[in-house]
Amino acid sequence: MPRKALKPKEKRGLPEPDSKFGSVQIARFISKLNFEGKKSIAESIMYGSFDIIKERTGEDPVSVFNRALENIRPLLEVRPRRVGGATYQVPMEVPVIRSTTLAINWLIGIARSKTGKPMREKLAQEIIDASKKEGAAVKKREDTHKMAEANKAFAHYRW
């Protein structure tokens, strides 16, 4: 149990908008990208990938980033539910904040798993692919939706 009182729910979770673009989504992405407390490196990776996105697509990188997140965000996911000794994978709708967090985690995880290029290039390529509804992150979303569809029979166990 915390010794200090927790902040109200409205004030928890969402960071201040980032300094360059004024976007809360980008600030959340930078916070997730943060590695070993080195936020300045995470910011340089993010802004560097935005420069690459602008160079390759000729579009506003923030709109490409937001479109990529929209294309990756899952609408359904399966959650384990134990009923009478058996565990069922129950499909459930995903709240907006969780779906955005999942999308951010998937983008970063996939970019980190690739090898051979600097992180800003891998991240930029993954964001561009996701904005075109291509790439591994979109495939991950489709797999999540397929899993929910396959377990639709257990939807009545929803709580």
Swiss-Prot record:
One of the primary rRNA binding proteins, it binds directly to 16S rRNA where it nucleates assembly of the head domain of the 30S subunit. Is located at the subunit interface close to the decoding center, probably blocks exit of the E-site tRNA. NCBIfam families: rpsG_bact. Belongs to the universal ribosomal protein uS7 family. One of its GO terms (biological process) is translation. It comes from the Bacteria. One of its GO terms (molecular function) is structural constituent of ribosome. The gene is rpsG. GO terms for cellular component: small ribosomal subunit. Pfam families: Ribosomal_S7. This is Small ribosomal subunit protein uS7. Part of the 30S ribosomal subunit. Contacts proteins S9 and S11. Keywords: Ribonucleoprotein, Ribosomal protein, RNA-binding, rRNA-binding, tRNA-binding. It comes from Endomicrobium trichonymphae.
